[in-house]
Amino acid sequence: MAGSGAFPLVLAGGCISCVGTLAGLGAPPTAIVWLDAHGDFNTPETTISGFLDGMALATAVGRCWGKLAATVPGFHPVPERQAVLVGAREFDVNERTLLDSSAVHLIDPQRIRNHGLRAELEPLWAKIQTYTGRAYLHFDLDVLDPAEAHVNQFAAPGGLTLTELLGIVSLVRERFALAAAAITAYDPEYDEGERAVRAAVGVIRELSKQV
């Protein structure tokens, strides 16, 4: 699909689906903008739960499951300096230590509110553009504050508003060619009034402006 010029939009249950999406993109190098309430940066050595989706970003940048990920044709780890984690506010202790020692860029919701979206993100986009001009956008819908939309059992307070989320998409589109996007981790059992569905549709509409 990517080779045909079509835009891949992946609707997935779990974040580890990123391995297949990135594999399908192939060369040239890609940045990752990962929007999630959690770090997804555990490894088999740090995880408390053993939850594979909690290791998804770490796998994408080559921190763990390297031999397994290498069995997916076309997959190559994304350099950490090209990965941005936005909106995360819940971490396991050892996961946070690992993340802080990495080259992954971490932007929490409070920094966005303190400095503004553009002021916080534009300098970072400029830095990453020295490595690549295209990006993969990954949305775990629990990046949203539960007051906006309760999307699954892992929802955590202090998240992004839908306005902030759509603003991030817009800023990415301004500076990068979008190679693909994924929307993940929706559980209808927790979605009161279909607010999460409406939020996801809003994201898709914003993404469609790229196509």
Where are the regions that the model predicts?
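Catalytic cores of soluble, metal-dependent hydrolases
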Residues: 1-10, 17-24, 98-211
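Active-site histidine-anchored catalytic micro-motif
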Residues: 2-73, 175-176
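Conserved beta-strand scaffold positions in the cores of enzyme catalytic domains, especially
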Residues: 32-34, 83-85, 106, 180
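Active-site flanking residues adjacent to catalytic metal/cofactor-binding acidic residues
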Residues: 35-37, 86, 137-141
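Active-site environment of divalent metal-dependent phosphoester hydrolases
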Residues: 42, 91-93, 188-190
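A conserved, positively charged/aromatic
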Residues: 77
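A general structural motif
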Residues: 84-92, 161-166
